[in-house]
Amino acid sequence: MSLAGEACGYDPDRTVKMVSGGPMMGFAVVGLDSTTKKTTGGLLLLSAGETNVTKTTHCLSCGKCADVCPMHLMPMNTVFYTEAADYEGAARMGGVLNCIECGACAYVCPARQPLIQSIRLAKAELRKRRAK
């Protein structure tokens, strides 16, 4: 077991989900060794009773994600364009490159859309394509 695991009280029999970075801006990780470094801000080790796994449904077009966005972006457009692999559309219509990845949109989404994951994917693809 890693030093981080020992410090956190990691129990592989109880832990069903690990989140690196905290509850709002963190991301799910597979293992402790590859994700913990001196810049890691937090590490959540969750048991089955501490997770609320809900299924993602189609976007309801409620606009809650846009209402809470501190950058006044349209996160719902990012998911739409990212699912279609139209990353330029995500930048143009969703403003994905201006996103600060605060997680507010994902927190309020009643459809549990993977907003932050879509934003991170679109940003990575855009940077990769524009670097060529």
Can you describe what each PLM-predicted range is?
Residues 1-111, 117-123, 131-132:
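Redox cofactor-anchoring modules in respiratory/redox and cofactor-processing assemblies
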